[in-house]
Design a protein with these regions (language model features):
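ATP-dependent carboxylate-amine ligase
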Residues: 1-139
């Protein structure tokens, strides 16, 4: 919330772009999903919707419910739906230019992603560092 406030206050002078990677957890707060999409839509320049702990829900359904709140972006132009979370992070990092801010939300310091009843090893920080390292070697 504080980042959003700072972003709104400096909207005219801020020369950076804010790029978000976000999802929504399955099996809870379905009614909040479009609201989450709307908030991120209003306060970021580019956004990527992705998978985040779907539990037993269809992850595409979750992504599409979040997308219902997006009114100011055009799919595949400044907003994307990418199921694979690593691919979503990779896309965000590829879009970023010097001075831009990439925000990856949802998983925080969690070490697993819940898919059905299965815990899949996952750590956003590790994946981000791996992708940055890989992109540095490609440049």
């Amino acid at each position: 919330v504080s980042l959003i406030r700072k972003r709104s206050a400096g909207q005219n002078t801020l020369k950076t772009h804010v790029i978000s990677v976000m999802g929504s957890c399955g099996e809870r707060d379905r009614g909040k999903r479009p609201m989450m999409g709307e908030i991120v839509d209003k306060h970021t320049d580019l956004m990527i919707l992705t998978n985040e702990d779907p539990y037993g829900e269809d992850p595409w359904q979750i992504i599409n419910e979040v997308a219902k709140g997006i009114k100011h972006k055009i799919e595949n132009e400044n907003f994307w739906k990418i199921m694979d979370r690593r691919e979503a992070i990779r896309k965000a990092l590829a879009l970023a230019r010097p001075g831009d801010v990439v925000i990856v939300t949802g998983k925080g310091a969690e070490e697993n992603m819940m898919v059905g009843n299965e815990k899949i090893p996952w750590n956003d920080k590790r994946v981000i560092l791996e992708e940055l390292s890989t992109s540095d070697s490609r440049d």
